[in-house]
UniProtKB/Swiss-Prot annotation:
Gene: kup
Cellular localization per UniProt: Cell inner membrane
Transmembrane intervals: 21-41, 58-78, 110-130, 152-172, 179-199, 223-243, 258-278, 296-316, 348-368, 377-397, 403-423, 427-447
Keywords: Cell inner membrane, Cell membrane, Ion transport, Membrane, Potassium, Potassium transport, Symport, Transmembrane, Transmembrane helix, Transport
Protein name, as recorded: Probable potassium transport system protein Kup
Pfam families in the record: K_trans (PF02705), K_trans_C (PF22776)
Annotated catalysed reactions: K(+)(in) + H(+)(in) = K(+)(out) + H(+)(out)
HAMAP family registered for this protein in UniProt: Kup
InterPro entries to which the protein is assigned, alphabetical: K+_transporter (IPR003855), K_trans_C (IPR053952), K_trans_N (IPR053951), Kup (IPR023051)
Organism expressing this protein natively: Xanthomonas euvesicatoria pv. vesicatoria (strain 85-10)
Function: Transport of potassium into the cell. Likely operates as a K(+):H(+) symporter.
One GO cellular component term: plasma membrane
Length: 634
């Protein structure tokens, strides 16, 4: 997951490189949607929906599944949404940044778009809990078909598989990741082969490709058909990954993978399961494994487990990536990030995210107990994210003069209707399990909003009580303190105000360094900062400098490296072994009389206290950093 957008997406890449990207995309991007056949039709015919697997109902459900894949994935994501790239990057955070750029800065509408983006990212993490749980559990449930006596061991085996997966994250996926594409490719061909095997025995199932059967299903079942969409949407879960991983593999490779491999194989496997149910209605108990020939059952269970582990791995890696972006954009506190590859910057491991996901996934597996129960909880976070993506796309496209207004309104009407129908079909299952991912999303949304608001209040308080740098320095130099050799770098969020760390240094040590740099780090709403805009240096006299460093939200801030570059661009003498970094470490004091409600003030104080220090986040050597404390009331 490390290709830069330009290399990944280049249309002039060599054929062997494009083939590698296609296979890589199949392994990472399509793992989630590729494991949906394990449980989609099983859920559609579960007692929860009260459907009987007669001829018309089977064809109706199959038609809805096929056209959901065509409308939501092929038309919406592959054809339209993937055109909205933020310098090659996709995903809901990137689309939020694009939509905000079309709105007046500081406006109410820009604020609302930011809220939508945060909530969409929060729902993504809810999806990140359900996907590994339901995928691996569905695969292991094949043991119930092969040997019913093993049913009591399904949950323990699932927990062991998931535990090993999360424990292995710290070692990175660089080596095993190379096998993801071929294994998932084998999985898709196995899906297609099983589909053809069963379709040959009931070729009339091909009639389901006619949308008339889907329309007929709605005509026969009225509002109950909308309710059934809660199961149909399981077929398109993972569609968001096509857009989210666009920066890693490029739009071209993802489109080719979908058109020539994934869509045909998914269509064949769903039709194959439908053909089986037409011949044997009792197969609805687990149509995926019932469709597998008896001799291939155990190998298929192993392959399915491998495919679901790969799907889970892709989502876990995506969670790390989104968390890293959210940190860079200031939505969540800094956390320790480990780079698991010497050659690939994008391969990271975030321990806090990993252990939180493991705990929540284990709770989901134990609490729900089987894939049928988890399926009722699954769709709401996915459909919520899809709906928010559509709204953000409409806002972004509105400002694009190349998009004709009639085409935009057609897109809005069709996909708002589709997404709202899917979301409604899942939200009405609130008491049956949909509350779980919504609760997770709401908790994360509250944390992100509290952190964002708390940081602004903290910045405002520091600025209010601060002294203007331009008036402080001339007064200081009237009676200059003793200057000692070396360079002092003061990290500051506001380059116009005297940093607390400088004031403390003067108060307690009564010295100034030979050179003093006021360094501000800014994260842009683009994935990668352009070379010409990365660094800005202002010399303000007497060996004082303002240095403004910009990073994209996909980059890892490296302050020492930025200062090395400042030697060439701004003439600042910089010796890493002769430089001391100073940072303020504020202690938050919650107050009931200002800012946020007292409970949010206390929550922010707790988050701030547990945030990772700047040392690791900005790649500052620990033996070169001095942190000075300050109390701030918010």
């Amino acid at each position: 997951m490390s290709h830069t957008p330009k290399s990944a997406g280049s249309s002039h890449a060599p054929a062997n490189s494009q083939t590698a990207l296609v296979i890589g995309a199949i392994g990472v991007v399509f793992g989630d949607i590729g494991t949906s056949p394990l449980y989609t039709l099983k859920e559609a015919f579960s007692p929860h929906y009260g459907l009987t697997p007669d001829h018309d109902t089977v064809l109706g459900i199959l038609s809805l599944v096929f056209w959901a894949l065509m409308l939501v994935v092929t038309l919406k994501y592959v054809t339209v949404i993937m055109r909205a790239d933020n310098d090659g990057e996709g995903g809901i955070m990137a689309l939020t940044a694009l939509a905000q750029r079309t709105l007046p800065g500081g406006s109410r509408s820009m604020y609302v778009v930011g809220i939508l983006g945060i909530f969409g990212a929060s729902l993504f993490f809810g999806d990140g809990v359900i996907t590994p749980a339901i995928s691996v559990l569905s695969a292991v449930e094949g043991l119930e078909v092969a040997a019913p006596r093993l049913e009591p061991f399904v949950v323990p085996i699932t927990l062991v598989v998931l535990g090993m997966l999360f424990l292995a994250q710290r070692f990175g996926t660089e080596r095993v990741g190379k096998a993801f594409g071929p294994i998932t490719l084998l999985w898709f061909f196995a899906l297609g082969a099983i589909g053809v095997y069963n379709m040959a025995r009931a070729p009339e199932v091909l009639h389901a490709l006619n949308p008339w059967w889907g329309v007929r299903f709605f005509a026969q079942h009225n509002w109950h058909a909308v309710f059934v969409l809660g199961a149909v949407v399981l077929a398109v879960t993972g569609g968001e990954a096509l857009y989210a991983d666009m920066g890693h593999f490029g739009a071209k490779a993802i489109r080719r993978s979908w058109q020539f491999v994934v869509l045909p194989m998914l269509t064949l496997t769903y039709l194959g399961q439908g053909a089986l149910m037409l011949r044997n209605p009792a197969a609805v108990s687990n149509p995926f494994y019932e469709a597998v020939p008896e001799w291939a059952l155990y190998p298929m269970i192993v392959l399915a487990t491998a495919a679901t582990v790969i799907a889970s791995q892709a989502l876990i890696t995506g969670a790390y990536s989104v968390a890293s972006q959210a940190m860079q954009l200031g939505y969540i506190p800094r956390m320790h990030i480990r780079h698991t590859s010497h050659s690939t910057i994008g391969q990271i491991y975030v321990p806090a995210v990993n252990w939180c996901l493991l705990a929540l996934v284990a709770v989901a597996v134990i609490g729900f107990g089987d894939s049928a129960s988890l399926a009722t909880a699954y769709g709401v976070s996915v459909t919520g994210t899809m709906l928010i993506t559509t709204v953000l796309m409409i806002i972004y496209a509105r400002a694009n003069p190349r998009v004709p207004a009639p085409l935009l309104w057609l897109f809005a009407l069709v996909f708002l209707a589709v997404d709202c129908a899917f979301f409604y079909a899942n939200i009405i299952k609130f008491l049956d399990g949909a509350w779980f991912p919504l609760l997770l999303g709401l908790i994360l949304f509250t944390l992100m909003r509290t952190w964002r608001r708390g940081r602004k209040l903290l910045h405002d308080e520091i600025r209010k009580d601060g002294i203007k740098l331009d008036t402080f320095l001339p007064g200081l130099m009237l009676a200059p303190p003793v200057r000692v050799p070396g360079t002092a770098v003061f990290l500051t969020a506001d380059p116009m105000v005297v940093p607390h760390a400088l004031m403390h240094n003067l108060k307690h040590n009564k010295v100034l360094h030979e050179r003093n740099v006021f360094l501000t780090v800014e994260t842009l709403q683009v994935p990668y900062a352009a070379a010409g805009k990365r660094l800005k240096i202002d010399a303000i006299g007497d060996e004082f400098y303002r240095v403004h460093v910009r990073f994209g939200f996909m980059e890892t801030p490296d302050v020492p490296l930025a200062l090395m570059r400042s030697c060439d661009q701004g003439g600042i003498y910089f010796d890493p072994m002769d430089t001391t970094y100073f940072a303020s470490r504020e202690t938050i004091v919650a107050s009931a009389n200002r800012g946020m409600p007292i409970w949010r003030d206390k929550l922010f104080a707790l988050m701030h206290r547990n945030a990772a220090p700047a040392t690791g986040f900005f790649r500052i050597p620990g033996n070169r950093l001095v942190e000075l404390g300050a109390q701030v009331e918010i």
